[in-house]
C-alpha cells in the first residue's frame, strides 16, 4: 500500500480536501494584486514644472510661457524656461520673446491628479532625475520574491508546509500594512521587500500543501484552480484600484485580509506525506485519522496504526535518515538534470512574461482596461492548458505554451507599429500562453521533484523566475539600438525552452516520487520499456532474415 492508497482509504477527495483547498487558495486572490500593485500605487500622472514662486502667470502670458515643448509638441515634464517666453520684461531684463534657456524643475512639479489622486511618485516626487527610484522599488520587491523563494522553500522542507504558511501570512499582513504607513521612500521599500519574500513562499507552499493531500487524478484540477484564482485576482485588482485610487488606502486594502488568513491558517492540517518523509509516523497517523473523521471515514481511519503505516510506507521512512540539501540538486545526476531543465523553463516563462507586462503603457488605453484584458485572456488560455494537461500530459502542455508564446512575440517584432490591432492581439495571445506556462510549470515541477526536496526544488525554480523578471527590464533597453531587438530576445528564449521540455519525463498518472531512488527507478523503467519496444521491432526483421537464409 502506497501513500495514494492511504489517501483513498481516508476519503480521497472529501470534505476535508474541499475545505482546506478553498482556505489555502483564497489568499492567492490578493497575491496577484501585490505582484502588480505598483502599476497603480506607483503610476506616473501627467506633470510639469512648477513656475517660480515669484512668477505672475497673468502678466507672464500664462503657464505656457514657462513650459517648453518636446518633439511631440507636448509640454516638457522635466524642464522649464528660466524666464517667460512672452509678456512684459522680466525682473532680470529679459526681452518679451525670452531667452529660451531652460532649467530643471527646481521648484517642484504640478501633477494631474484627475486619474491617480495620490501615488508614491507624486508623494515623493519620483520623476525626472529621480524616476529610477520608481523602478528600484519594484526591483526590490522582486529581490524579496527571489530571497523568499530560496529561504522559505528550504524552511518548508525542514519545518513543514503549515508552519511556514502561518509565518508568511503574518509577515505579509504586517509588512504590507507598515508599507501603507511608510513615512518615506526607504521605509516603503524595506517593507515591500519583506512582502515579496512572504508572498513568494505563499505561492509555493499553497501548491505543495494542496497537491500532497490530493489523489493522483485530481492534482491537475488543483493546479488549474490555483491558476484561475490568480487570474481572478487580476480582475479584482482592477476593481479595487478603481474604487480606492489613493495609494496608501489601496496598499491597506490588499494587505489587511492576510490577518484573516493568518488566523484561520492555524486550522490547516500539515501534509501527512511530509510527516512520513520526516519519519514522524505518530504525526502521520494523527493527521490521516483527523482527515478520515472530517471526510466521514472514521471507521477506516481507526483501522490505521503505526504498524500499518510502517509496513505501507517503507519507502517514505527511508527519508527519515536525513533530508536532502539544496546542494543535492547539483550533486545527484538525476536531480541535476531536472534542476537545469526546469530552471530554463522557469526563467524563460518569467522573462518573456514580464517583458510583455512591462510594456502595458504602449497600448495607449486605460490601465484599468489593460488590467482586465490581461486577466481575461488567462481564463480561456488556462482552460485549454487544463484540457491538454489532463488528456495529453504535462510535457506537451508545457512545450506548446512556451512555443506558441515565443512565436507570437517573434512575429510581433516584424509587424510595423502602425498595425496596432494586430500587435495588441499577438501580445495578448502571447501573454495568455505564458500564463498557461506558469500554470503548468508549478504543477509539473511539484510532480517531478521527490518529496524530500520538493519545496527546495520549487523554491529554486521560483528563484530562476525572479532572475528572469529582473533581467527583463535590462533587455528592454536594447530597443535603443534596434526597436524590435527586445521582442526578438523575448521570443527566442521561450522557443529554446520549449525544446528543453522534451528532455523531461511525463508525469501524467504517475505517483509523486518520494525519494531520489524513485526518480532513478522511473528513468530505468522507461529505458527498459524502450528496449523492449526495440526488441519487438527487431523480431520480425530477424525472422525475415532467417527465412531468407533458409532459402
From Swiss-Prot:
Biological source species: Rattus norvegicus (Rat)
Polar residues composition bias: residue spans: 542-551
Extracellular compartment segments: 31-135, 188-195, 246-248, 359-368, 417-425, 506-551
Record's subcellular location: Cell membrane; Basolateral cell membrane; Basal cell membrane
KW Membrane (keyword) present: yes
Residues linked to a glycan: 39, 56, 92, 113
Alphabetical list of InterPro entries matching this protein: MFS_dom (IPR020846), MFS_sugar_transport-like (IPR005828), MFS_trans_sf (IPR036259), Orgcat_transp/SVOP (IPR004749)
UniProt PTM: Glycosylated. Glycosylation is necessary for proper targeting of the transporter to the plasma membrane.
Expressing tissues: Highly expressed in kidney; in the particular segment of the proximal tubule. In kidney, found preferentially in the cortex and outer medulla and weakly in the inner medulla. Expressed to a lower extent in brain.
GO CC terms: basal plasma membrane; basolateral plasma membrane; caveola; plasma membrane; protein-containing complex
Major localisation: membrane
Purpose: Secondary active transporter that functions as a Na(+)-independent organic anion (OA)/dicarboxylate antiporter where the uptake of one molecule of OA into the cell is coupled with an efflux of one molecule of intracellular dicarboxylate such as alpha-ketoglutarate or glutarate. Mediates the uptake of OA across the basolateral side of proximal tubule epithelial cells, thereby contributing to the renal elimination of endogenous OA from the systemic circulation into the urine.
UniProt region (Disordered), positions on chain: 514-551
Induction comment from the UniProt entry of this chain: Down-regulated by PGE2 and in ischemic kidney.
Name of this chain's protein: Solute carrier family 22 member 6
GO molecular function, one term: sodium-independent organic anion transmembrane transporter activity
Membrane topology: Multi-pass membrane protein
Similarity section: Belongs to the major facilitator (TC 2.A.1) superfamily. Organic cation transporter (TC 2.A.1.19) family.
Domain of life of the native organism: Eukaryota
GO biological process entries: alpha-ketoglutarate transport; metanephric proximal tubule development; monoatomic anion transport; organic anion transport; prostaglandin transport; renal tubular secretion; sodium-independent organic anion transport
Biased composition (Low complexity): 526-537
One Pfam family this sequence matches: Sugar_tr
Gene: Slc22a6
Amino acid at each position: 500500500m502506497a501513500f495514494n492508497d492511504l489517501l483513498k482509504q481516508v476519503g480521497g477527495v472529501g470534505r476535508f480536501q474541499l475545505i482546506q483547498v478553498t482556505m489555502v487558495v483564497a489568499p492567492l486572490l490578493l497575491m496577484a494584486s501585490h505582484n502588480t500593485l505598483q502599476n497603480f500605487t506607483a503610476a506616473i500622472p501627467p506633470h510639469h514644472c512648477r513656475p517660480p514662486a515669484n512668477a505672475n502667470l497673468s502678466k507672464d502670458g500664462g503657464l505656457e510661457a514657462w513650459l517648453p515643448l518636446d518633439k511631440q509638441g507636448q509640454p516638457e515634464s522635466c524642464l522649464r524656461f528660466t524666464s517667460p517666453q512672452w509678456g512684459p520684461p522680466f525682473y532680470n531684463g529679459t526681452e518679451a520673446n525670452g531667452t529660451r534657456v531652460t532649467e530643471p524643475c527646481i521648484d517642484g512639479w504640478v501633477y494631474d491628479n484627475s486619474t491617480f489622486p495620490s501615488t508614491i511618485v507624486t508623494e515623493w516626487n519620483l520623476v525626472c532625475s529621480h524616476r529610477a527610484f520608481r523602478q528600484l522599488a519594484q526591483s526590490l520587491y522582486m529581490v524579496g520574491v527571489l530571497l523568499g523563494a530560496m529561504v522559505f522553500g528550504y524552511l518548508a522542507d525542514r519545518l513543514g508546509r503549515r508552519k511556514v504558511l502561518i509565518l508568511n501570512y503574518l509577515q505579509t499582513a504586517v509588512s504590507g500594512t507598515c508599507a501603507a504607513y511608510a513615512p518615506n521612500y526607504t521605509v516603503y521599500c524595506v517593507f515591500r521587500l519583506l512582502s515579496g519574500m512572504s508572498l513568494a513562499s505563499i505561492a509555493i507552499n499553497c501548491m505543495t500543501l494542496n497537491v500532497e493531500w490530493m489523489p493522483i487524478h485530481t492534482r491537475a484540477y488543483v493546479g488549474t484552480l490555483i491558476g484561475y484564482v490568480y487570474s481572478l485576482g487580476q480582475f479584482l485588482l482592477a476593481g479595487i484600484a478603481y474604487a480606492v485610487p489613493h495609494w496608501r488606502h489601496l496598499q491597506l486594502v490588499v494587505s489587511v485580509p492576510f490577518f484573516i488568513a493568518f488566523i484561520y491558517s492555524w486550522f490547516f492540517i500539515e501534509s501527512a506525506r511530509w510527516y512520513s518523509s520526516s519519519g514522524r509516523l505518530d504525526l502521520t497517523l494523527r493527521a490521516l485519522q483527523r482527515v478520515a473523521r472530517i471526510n466521514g471515514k472514521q471507521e477506516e481511519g481507526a483501522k490505521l496504526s503505526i504498524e500499518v503505516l510502517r509496513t505501507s510506507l517503507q519507502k517514505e521512512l527511508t527519508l527519515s535518515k536525513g533530508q536532502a540539501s539544496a546542494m543535492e540538486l547539483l550533486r545527484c545526476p538525476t536531480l541535476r538534470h531536472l534542476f537545469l531543465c526546469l530552471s530554463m523553463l522557469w526563467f524563460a516563462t518569467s522573462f518573456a512574461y514580464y517583458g510583455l507586462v512591462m510594456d502595458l503603457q504602449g497600448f495607449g488605453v486605460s490601465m484599468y482596461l489593460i488590467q482586465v484584458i490581461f486577466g481575461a485572456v488567462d481564463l480561456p488560455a488556462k482552460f485549454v492548458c487544463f484540457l491538454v494537461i489532463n488528456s495529453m500530459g504535462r510535457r506537451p502542455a508545457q512545450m506548446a505554451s512556451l512555443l506558441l508564446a515565443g512565436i507570437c512575440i517573434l512575429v510581433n517584432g516584424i509587424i510595423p507599429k502602425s498595425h496596432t490591432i494586430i500587435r495588441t492581439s499577438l501580445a495578448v495571445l502571447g501573454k495568455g500562453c505564458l500564463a498557461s506556462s506558469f500554470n503548468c510549470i508549478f504543477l509539473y515541477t511539484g510532480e517531478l521533484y521527490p518529496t524530500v526536496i520538493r519545496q527546495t526544488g520549487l523554491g529554486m525554480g521560483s528563484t530562476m523566475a525572479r532572475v528572469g523578471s529582473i533581467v527583463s527590464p535590462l533587455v528592454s533597453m536594447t530597443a535603443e539600438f534596434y526597436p524590435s531587438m527586445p521582442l526578438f530576445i523575448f521570443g527566442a528564449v521561450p522557443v529554446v525552452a520549449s525544446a528543453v521540455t522534451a528532455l523531461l519525463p511525463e508525469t501524467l498518472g504517475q505517483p509523486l516520487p518520494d525519494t531520489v531512488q524513485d526518480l532513478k527507478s522511473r528513468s530505468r523503467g522507461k529505458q527498459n520499456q524502450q528496449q523492449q519496444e526495440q526488441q519487438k521491432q527487431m523480431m520480425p526483421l530477424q525472422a525475415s532474415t532467417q527465412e531468407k537464409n533458409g532459402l
